Amino acid sequence: LRYKIMTNRFIILCLLVLVSITNSSSLASNKFAKFIVWNENRKLTWNDFNAKPERSYPNMEEAQTVSSIEVGYTSTNKKIEITIAAKFYPNLSWHYSNINSSYILQHEQLHFDITELYARMMRKQISEQVKSSKDKSKYNSIVKKIMNNWDNEQNAYDDQTNHGANKTEQLKWENNIQLRLA
């Protein structure tokens, strides 16, 4: 399962790069075209999970959240503009139709919250350390490090909570992430 999650994130990052260099007409048909930008006032609902499960994962997954940290970088006349957003992809995220538990939904929401947490970390580090187009290698280093840490924390979250089955650990994670987002 860990390999699958890491692979999905790697594929997502690669596809985001490809999407950014394709023209806008092909973007409309792409599964990444529909997304939800993280907002503290907008929580996920089961209606946001529109993909069909690819296969059965007995006793492992009842839902899957696909989210990303989308990073945009443009440079003109030595000035840089960087945009960073935590995004959730409804057309890639799924749940089994017989699963409508608010508890499982909260577990999936926290995956998206962790994505936002790392988007904020990236925004902060880049704004503090990247001042001009000369800092592109510093920018690349920050992005790589944050993405790696984000992936590690997502995996630790699932491992320690047993995908939400361990309610004591789940509550610890919820409290920790909410404090870090505050």
Enumerate the language-model features and the residues they cover:
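Active-site recognition of the HExxH zinc-binding catalytic motif
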Residues: 103-115
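Residue-level marker of positions within ordered structural domains that often coincide
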Residues: 25, 91, 155
